[in-house]
Amino acid sequence: MASRPWQPGGPDWNADIKPGPIEIGFDYNFIMPATGDRVPCVYVENHRVVGLDPKDPIQVSFAQPVGAEPTGKDHPELLRMHPSHGHDQTIVNGISRIGYMSGGKAARWVDQDMADTITTKAVAFLEQNRNKPFFLYFATHDPHVPRVPHPRFVGKSGCGVRGDAIVEFDWCAGEILKTLDRLKLPDNTLVILSSDNGPVVDDGYRDGAVENLNGHRPVGPLRGGKYSVFEGGTRVPFILRWPGRVKPGLSDALVCQIDFLASFAALTGQTLATQDAPDSFNVLPALLGESKTGREHLVEQAGILAWRQGPRKLIEAGKGPRINKATNTEMGNNPTGQFYNLTLDLGETNNLAAQNAETVKSYQSRLNAIRNAGRSRP
């Protein structure tokens, strides 16, 4: 329902916007063109920008200014939220973004209303499709930057605006579940809640997120965070609910979101061609709680690659910076490579590469073979 199908360069925002989700099989979409900190700050419904006045056409550029819109770099006095790094171009709703935009004023979203807008659309979709099979991809903006929760959530977390945005996200998820319950659909509806990466606190705005953590450690016992090849960047929350099929419980099975394709193909009796989803494995028994094991191995990526096999993890040698200074995140780069046993050392603090030279060599060989083949599924 709210995804990010286009990146800088984009289409003509004043005409039919194609290709998009409909061209790859969706019947309907209500989406954000990019992340909330990028222009254009509008919604797209199917092929058109919502609420666009044709007399006020949209222009977008990520290379140079367009129109006469003020920027955060030149007019910081107009900002209600200042950037900490980047995010200093066109100002929309008192917040400077990545990229330049002009026009489309009637179509621009209101940041504090985004959760309500997207969730209302998702609830309507469920109501309209209650009597037939459906697939809903519901991607919230929260807790991505800029963090501007609705006033009814402000101050509710005790951990500043980032915590409040997470409370708002929790409300969004709750509305979806409550709707399924109200429509008497939960027993035959598989719901997955997950994230695209690990946490980040300062991701481009001086919003007080760092100062208001109040002892909370978003990454928990893990090392790194968003942008990192350490587990704090690549290991993400994953909750599956299917009351009619899956019993409540916990699992340590190794699975990846890419595995959804092969797993749900198996669930629905479909066959994947060899060239389709070349890195997707069928881990349906693990997802359904019928097996405690998932895939045998996993390639992780964040600039450099890592190889997970059971609890053991090889991070290949990397020449990049060890710290992303803008976000204060350990990246995982090390010129000699790293090897960890995650059962004994979940925080990846004890590099065992020197003591496991043969295993490191074997894992690196397998990683290189997959890189050269361009696929990991046989």
List where the protein language model places each region.
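C-terminal cap/loop subdomain of S1 sulfatases and analogous C-terminal strand-loop tails that border
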Residues: 7-37, 51-52, 199-231, 245-338, ...
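Loop/turn elements at helix/coil->beta-strand transitions in domains of secreted/extracellular proteins
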Residues: 24-27, 129-136, 185-191, 235-236, ...
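Metal-dependent active-site segment of extracytoplasmic phospho-/sulfohydrolases and closely related
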Residues: 168-206
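Active-site His/acidic residue clusters
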Residues: 39, 45-48, 122-164, 200-202, ...
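Anion-binding catalytic surfaces of enzymes that hydrolyze or transfer phosphate/sulfate esters
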Residues: 77-151
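Catalytic-site neighborhoods of secreted/periplasmic enzymes
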Residues: 1-104
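Short glycine/proline-rich turn/loop motifs
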Residues: 95-107, 151-156, 241-245, 343-348
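Long, internal low-complexity/basic segments
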Residues: 75-90, 94-99, 111, 122, ...
